[in-house]
Amino acid sequence: MKIAVLGGGSWGTALAHLLAGKGEDVRLWVRDPAVVEGVNRDHENPRYLKGLHLHEALRATCDAGEALEGADILLSVVPCQQTRTVLRSLRPRLKTGMVVVSASKGIETDGLRTVGEMVEDELAGLAPRYAVISGPSFAAEVVAGMPTAVVLGCADRDLGGTLREVFSTPTFRTYSCTDVRGVELGGAVKNVIAIAAGLSDGLGFGSNARAGLITRGLAEMGRLGVALGARGSTFMGLSGLGDLVLTCTGDLSRNRQVGLRLAEGQGLDAIVAGMGMVAEGVKTTEAVYELAQREGVDLPITQAMYAVLHDGRDPRDMVQELMTRELREE
């Protein structure tokens, strides 16, 4: 099976490596010629996964046409805010009925659309068959062959079963479900809560506060998801609770790192510029906040993070406001 992977960041590279190791014909589309050279010559992504050996069968290219030629599956791992532009530019090269799998986690800020909705918008008339893969999965650990479990959401149960097999290895276990919206929203909202968890840890608020943020963050994720048509049970799975716990506690989490650096007094622009990789939660906070306003859903942690990130509020003041909100049943 030929698979075109769009996006040569850490996660796109990790998934391309995983699939190449299974014997799939994988082409990784990357815009940076230095990354292409590193993957093809040195079997390493020098920018995002330096020091980790990639499968020698994996080939990278800057030529989108070369990557997409004859592809059975398009695996999109470009940052969420760039997805619409990339899909629009590649549409003339895509065939009708193509399988499109997203591994990006976020919500578009301009249109408040998930990746699946952007695929519907931009590939209308091509009848794409869509799926999303998400879950607790640091790229470096996947490349290192450490045990990982994720979930693949696909409305077509048969296609979901087929893709579940494609994306599974002895160290990478893929479950499937039909709740595409739930899988997408879990992967997006957890990034907002992860920034809050990093901020809390950086301010020295302790383990109790982190556990409270994770638990109440899960409640926010579920409330918004159900309001948008997802199943509440999905958020208790790998794309919800699983990814939330990992991203709020693991030091490889970019969004947690944003929170930690905010606690040190660094400015948001400097943090984002200095990371070298996309932390989806910064933009997603804005999108989730706007969605909550539109749907009339109460998301106090998200509202607090929006105030910190986009209104310049003092994090300690926002913690005080969260802790002194009107008391209620859980």
Swiss-Prot record:
This is Glycerol-3-phosphate dehydrogenase [NAD(P)+]. It is an enzyme of class 1 (oxidoreductase). Sn-glycerol 3-phosphate binds at residues 105, 135, 137, 190, 243, 253-255. One of its GO terms (biological process) is glycerol-3-phosphate biosynthetic process. InterPro entries: 6-PGluconate_DH-like_C_sf, 6PGD_dom2, G3P_DH_NAD-dep, G3P_DH_NAD-dep_C, G3P_DH_NAD-dep_N, NAD(P)-bd_dom_sf. It catalyses: sn-glycerol 3-phosphate + NAD(+) = dihydroxyacetone phosphate + NADH + H(+); sn-glycerol 3-phosphate + NADP(+) = dihydroxyacetone phosphate + NADPH + H(+). PANTHER family: GLYCEROL-3-PHOSPHATE DEHYDROGENASE, GLYCEROL-3-PHOSPHATE DEHYDROGENASE [NAD(+)] 2, CHLOROPLASTIC. GO terms for cellular component: cytosol. It comes from Nitratidesulfovibrio vulgaris (strain ATCC 29579 / DSM 644 / CCUG 34227 / NCIMB 8303 / VKM B-1760 / Hildenborough). Keywords: Cytoplasm, Lipid biosynthesis, Lipid metabolism, NAD, NADP, Nucleotide-binding, Oxidoreductase, Phospholipid biosynthesis, Phospholipid metabolism. GO terms for molecular function: glycerol-3-phosphate dehydrogenase [NAD(P)+] activity; NAD binding.
